[in-house]
Amino acid sequence: MVLIRVLANLLILQLSYAQRSSELVIGGDECNINEHRFLALVYTDRFQCGGTLINPEWVLTAAHCDRRYMHIYLGVHNESVQYDDEQRRFPKKKYFCLSSKNYTRWDKDIMLIRLNRPVRNSAHIAHLSLPSKPPSVGSVCRVMGWGTITSPNETLPDVPRCANINLFNYTVCRGVFPWLPARSRILCAGVLQGGIDTCKRDSGGPLICNGQFQGIVSWGPKPCAQPREPALYTKVFDHLDWIQSIIAGNTTVTCPP
């Protein structure tokens, strides 16, 4: 009976979003160079993530992107081009929900990075504000990043790709992934027809719904972009108090349970 309800919900969502999603280009398109001024490229020698500049001194990304040595680039579009206003920073301090850095696919996959010095706003660099309200189910959301554009084999683009995906009720992801808990501080988003998705190396990047920064790319099934398999995003709104408290200097604050 539960399985029947889940399949029915998926069918309803598939039909309700079909027209909207069919307008999209499979896999997304190159982002407009002025569309992602807040998008950070979080990089080590063998690993790459995205991130979001939330003020001149702080970047928000996923906890699973943490590495010992990290470079954070702002103002990048084409990775093979050096831009005049491109800026590189390093983590001065990294903050996690738990001191042990424990996180799961559905809980506490969030990392707040204080940069070694503030970045300067420019034609290609500006911060993205934290959300003022939670997202609404049914929203069309924007994702972006330099992640692979093919899966399971990787094809990495030089420029970030942008695409629109749909925000679903959490129960949709629970129906697809039965191991998810009954309640969680994550968002469920994707395109039920498949073909559009975030993927490897997009982790840590933003999910922007109705112009507001609502999610952090966390986890998705492999291969990416499969039909009826949405991805999981850390819900930024539920972590606002934690983020704002740390920025204000209260570094002992803990994440919501």
UniProtKB/Swiss-Prot annotation:
Entry keyword set: Disulfide bond, Glycoprotein, Hemostasis impairing toxin, Hydrolase, Protease, Secreted, Serine protease, Signal, Toxin, Zymogen
GO cellular component: extracellular region; secretory granule
Pfam families registered for this protein in UniProt: Trypsin
Expressed in which tissues: Expressed by the venom gland.
Disulphide bond pairs: C31-C162, C49-C65, C141-C209, C173-C188, C199-C224
Domain Peptidase S1 residues, every copy: 25-248
Active site positions: H64 (charge relay system), D109 (charge relay system), S203 (charge relay system)
Residues of this chain annotated as glycosylated in UniProt: N78, N102, N153, N169, N250
Signal peptide: 1-18
Taxonomy of the source species: Eukaryota, Metazoa, Chordata, Craniata, Vertebrata
GO MF, any single term: toxin activity
Quaternary structure annotation from Swiss-Prot or TrEMBL: Monomer.
Species of provenance: Trimeresurus stejnegeri
Record protein name field: Snake venom serine protease CL5
